[in-house]
Amino acid sequence: MRSPRFCSFLRPLLLLTALFLLLLPAVGTAQRPAAETGGRWSLRPGVGYTVGALVPTPLPAELRSIAHYSPVGGLRFGADAVYHTGGRVDLSLGAYFTDRGMDSEVRVAGYRTRVVRGAQQLSGYFFGTNATRARLRGLFVPLALRYPLGRCTLTGGAYLEWYSLRQFSGTASDGYLRVERPTGDKVLFGPKNDGSATYDFSDALNDSGFGVHLGAEYPLSPRFLLNAQLTWGLTPAFDGSFTAVPTPLHPLGFTLGVNYVIGGGR
């Protein structure tokens, strides 16, 4: 018997594949000059580096300052299969391994969360420094329309992701927690690794996501393409029912990479 997780993986992938097949005849109605067309299909293996973040939307009122941010991970590799329609717009479907994340440190005031200190599990309103490491690693499947514009090609569409590694953990330090309510008992937290509290919400992260992407390609040579892509996750990192992170966090990524064209046209 198939597990619910397998079904949740398979259904969106089948829908994306069906959408790809349905779009094949639709995007080729306006004919491109014969000189600009080659074979119907091309394969484009590629590698790139992704800078990622989980962006709160909207920015929480409890955020006072951002002391530190740096990307974690970043490698992306895989391939796009491009269908050259003979029209003005081509179509592609890709599959990539993706690995992105961030380290961040912020000051907050009155931020509702849940932490562990020693043997105690505490929830309430935190005032102090919040340090987080977030990471998402897995399969990235983009569906794109491709529109040549001069020497460049503009790309845009939707994507699905499934995560084999999910991490969202950190520390609460240099402050205090009001237990359960804003006027609750005050629990003091010392510096990091010296009286601070910890949290790990990795298991609560969604194991898949849906989003949109926009990018561009530029030919470095007849076969090598430089590409840039911006992705925005429409699916929040946590479900709305998860209260330890009250503000919706959306995956954001920017990738710069190179692809090699095998067969087909541009």
Where do the language-model regions lie?
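Extracellular/periplasm-exposed beta-strand and loop segments of Gram-negative cell-envelope proteins
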Residues: 53-72, 100-137, 163-207, 236-253
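Cleavable N-terminal export/targeting peptides
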Residues: 1-39, 264-266
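Repeated loop/turn-to-beta-strand initiation elements of outer-membrane beta-barrel proteins
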Residues: 88-91, 151-154, 222-228, 264-266
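Extended, folded domain segments that form the structural surfaces/walls around functional sites
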Residues: 36, 41, 49, 66-71, ...
